[in-house]
Each structure stands twice: as C-alpha cells, then as structure tokens.
Amino acid sequence: MNAVFIVFLSAILSYPHESFAEELATKHKHVEHCLGSDGEGHPLNEFWYDDGMCQRFYCFRDDEGIIYEQITNCPIAIAEGDCKINPGTAGSYPDCCPTVICPDSPKAF
C-alpha cells in the first residue's frame, strides 16, 4: 500500500510544469463550442436562454484559452413604501424579470 502511494505521489510530483488547466486550454483552443450547464453544446460568444428559470447564458474563451459559462439571473426586486413588485412578462431574460414600480416615480427601476 505504501509503495503504491509513493509511486502515485512521485507521478504527481514529476508531472510537467504546465498545469492541467493550461494543457486542456492548449488542446482545446480550436474548439468553438462549449458544453452548457443544460448539457447541450453552444457556440462561443452567443447568448442562449432558459425562459422557465428566466436566465441568460453566455460562453466565452479568456486570454489563456479557458472556456467559461456566464449565467445571468434577474436582480433581486425589493419594494419599499408605496412601491410594488410587478412580475415579469412571459418570455426571455430580461423581460421575464420582476420590476419595482413606485407611484411617485414615472420609471421602473
């Protein structure tokens, strides 16, 4: 058991100086899609939406070639005083997000 652990530890310590993330980024620089949290492939630098959860998604590659998924949710709506929360409409983000309407303010914020 100790011999196996020592061999494993030696293998880890002798791993090349390039990190695992850097190696993956190098291997996947040609990839033009990302695997979204919905389990589907999506083109980089394009938005897609989950209307049921009122979320917007976006995949991009950083300067080092690592691909990230950005998930945007509705801001928290807090109504104080005479203000009221107006539920969002059906559809995609941001139209589905709730808004705060105040009687003394002509704009929703």
Swiss-Prot record:
One of its GO terms (cellular component) is extracellular region. Contains 4 disulfide bonds. Keywords: Disulfide bond, Secreted, Signal, Toxin. It is found in: Secreted. SMART domains: SVWC. It comes from the Eukaryota. It holds the Pfam family SVWC. GO terms for molecular function: toxin activity. Expressed by the venom gland. InterPro entries: SVWC_dom. The keyword Lyase does not apply. Coiled coil: none annotated. The keyword Chloroplast does not apply. Its main location: secreted. Residues 1-21 form the signal peptide. Belongs to the scoloptoxin-16 family. This is U-scoloptoxin(16)-Cw1a. It comes from Cormocephalus westwoodi (Westwood's green centipede).
